[in-house]
Regions:
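Glycine-rich, proline-tolerant flexible connector loops at the mouths of alpha/beta enzymes
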Residues: 67-89
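Intrinsic disorder at enzyme termini
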Residues: 1-21
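Conserved small/polar residues in nucleotide/adenosyl-binding loops
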Residues: 114-116
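Hydrophobic faces of well-ordered beta-strands that scaffold small-molecule active sites
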Residues: 33-36, 69-71, 95-103
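N-terminal small/glycine-rich loop or linker at the start of catalytic domains
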Residues: 23-46
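Catalytic domains of carbohydrate-active enzymes, especially glycoside hydrolases
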Residues: 56-72
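Active-site beta-loop-alpha junctions enriched in small/polar residues
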Residues: 74-76, 102-108
Length: 116
Protein backbone atom coordinates (compact mmCIF):
# COMPACT_ATOMS: atom_id res chain seq x y z
CA UNK A 1 0.00 0.00 0.00
CA UNK A 2 1.28 3.48 -0.87
CA UNK A 3 1.18 6.23 1.70
CA UNK A 4 0.62 9.88 0.84
CA UNK A 5 2.80 11.01 3.73
CA UNK A 6 5.94 10.09 1.79
CA UNK A 7 5.41 13.12 -0.46
CA UNK A 8 6.62 16.57 0.53
CA UNK A 9 4.20 19.49 0.40
CA UNK A 10 3.92 20.78 -3.16
CA UNK A 11 3.34 24.48 -2.53
CA UNK A 12 5.72 26.75 -4.38
CA UNK A 13 5.31 30.50 -3.99
CA UNK A 14 5.19 32.55 -7.18
CA UNK A 15 8.47 34.25 -8.05
CA UNK A 16 8.77 37.90 -7.09
CA UNK A 17 8.59 40.02 -10.18
CA UNK A 18 7.29 43.38 -11.22
CA UNK A 19 3.80 42.88 -12.62
CA UNK A 20 3.23 46.25 -14.28
CA UNK A 21 0.11 44.97 -16.04
CA UNK A 22 -1.59 44.27 -12.70
CA UNK A 23 -1.14 47.86 -11.54
CA UNK A 24 -2.78 49.46 -14.58
CA UNK A 25 -6.26 50.87 -14.23
CA UNK A 26 -6.90 50.98 -17.99
CA UNK A 27 -5.60 49.51 -21.21
CA UNK A 28 -3.70 51.68 -23.67
CA UNK A 29 -4.65 49.84 -26.84
CA UNK A 30 -7.30 47.28 -27.71
CA UNK A 31 -6.47 43.58 -27.37
CA UNK A 32 -5.91 41.43 -30.43
CA UNK A 33 -8.72 38.88 -30.67
CA UNK A 34 -8.13 35.49 -32.29
CA UNK A 35 -11.16 33.57 -33.53
CA UNK A 36 -10.91 29.81 -32.99
CA UNK A 37 -14.47 29.14 -34.19
CA UNK A 38 -13.43 27.43 -37.43
CA UNK A 39 -11.52 24.79 -35.48
CA UNK A 40 -12.95 24.51 -31.98
CA UNK A 41 -16.49 25.43 -32.96
CA UNK A 42 -16.52 22.98 -35.86
CA UNK A 43 -15.39 20.10 -33.64
CA UNK A 44 -18.39 20.57 -31.38
CA UNK A 45 -20.96 20.34 -34.18
CA UNK A 46 -22.88 17.09 -34.71
CA UNK A 47 -22.57 17.63 -38.46
CA UNK A 48 -19.30 19.50 -39.18
CA UNK A 49 -19.33 22.35 -41.67
CA UNK A 50 -18.77 21.60 -45.34
CA UNK A 51 -15.92 23.16 -47.28
CA UNK A 52 -18.21 25.87 -48.68
CA UNK A 53 -19.68 26.61 -45.24
CA UNK A 54 -16.18 26.96 -43.80
CA UNK A 55 -15.19 29.34 -46.61
CA UNK A 56 -18.32 31.44 -46.00
CA UNK A 57 -17.62 31.51 -42.27
CA UNK A 58 -13.99 32.55 -42.87
CA UNK A 59 -15.16 35.43 -45.08
CA UNK A 60 -17.62 36.43 -42.34
CA UNK A 61 -14.87 36.48 -39.68
CA UNK A 62 -12.72 38.67 -41.95
CA UNK A 63 -15.70 40.98 -42.55
CA UNK A 64 -16.20 41.25 -38.77
CA UNK A 65 -12.62 42.51 -38.52
CA UNK A 66 -10.72 39.58 -37.01
CA UNK A 67 -6.98 39.93 -37.70
CA UNK A 68 -6.01 36.53 -36.28
CA UNK A 69 -7.98 33.42 -37.19
CA UNK A 70 -7.26 29.82 -36.25
CA UNK A 71 -8.44 28.12 -39.42
CA UNK A 72 -8.42 24.48 -38.41
CA UNK A 73 -6.70 21.20 -37.72
CA UNK A 74 -5.63 20.06 -41.23
CA UNK A 75 -4.27 16.70 -40.09
CA UNK A 76 -7.68 15.76 -38.65
CA UNK A 77 -9.58 15.30 -41.91
CA UNK A 78 -9.49 15.77 -45.65
CA UNK A 79 -12.09 18.57 -45.40
CA UNK A 80 -9.88 20.51 -42.99
CA UNK A 81 -6.88 20.06 -45.30
CA UNK A 82 -8.86 21.05 -48.42
CA UNK A 83 -10.21 24.12 -46.62
CA UNK A 84 -6.69 25.34 -45.91
CA UNK A 85 -5.68 24.62 -49.53
CA UNK A 86 -8.70 26.61 -50.76
CA UNK A 87 -7.80 29.61 -48.59
CA UNK A 88 -4.32 29.63 -50.10
CA UNK A 89 -5.13 28.79 -53.72
CA UNK A 90 -8.04 31.25 -53.92
CA UNK A 91 -5.99 34.01 -52.21
CA UNK A 92 -8.70 34.50 -49.57
CA UNK A 93 -6.38 35.50 -46.72
CA UNK A 94 -6.03 39.30 -46.63
CA UNK A 95 -2.53 40.71 -46.11
CA UNK A 96 -3.48 42.12 -42.71
CA UNK A 97 -4.91 38.82 -41.41
CA UNK A 98 -2.79 36.13 -39.76
CA UNK A 99 -4.00 32.54 -39.85
CA UNK A 100 -2.86 29.69 -37.66
CA UNK A 101 -3.46 25.96 -37.54
CA UNK A 102 -3.44 23.39 -34.78
CA UNK A 103 -1.34 20.29 -35.33
CA UNK A 104 0.43 17.48 -33.56
CA UNK A 105 4.15 17.91 -33.02
CA UNK A 106 5.23 15.19 -35.45
CA UNK A 107 7.80 15.78 -38.18
CA UNK A 108 5.80 14.32 -41.08
CA UNK A 109 2.65 16.27 -40.14
CA UNK A 110 4.49 19.57 -39.71
CA UNK A 111 6.29 19.06 -43.03
CA UNK A 112 2.99 18.36 -44.81
CA UNK A 113 1.64 21.67 -43.49
CA UNK A 114 4.70 23.58 -44.65
CA UNK A 115 4.13 22.26 -48.17
CA UNK A 116 0.48 23.33 -48.28
Amino acid sequence: MMHADKYKPGYFPAPRCEMRWAKKDHIEKPPIWCSVDLRDGNQSLIVPMSLEEKLDFFRFLVKLGFKEIEVGFPAASETEYEFLRALIEQHLIPDDVTVQVLTQCRDHIILSLIHI
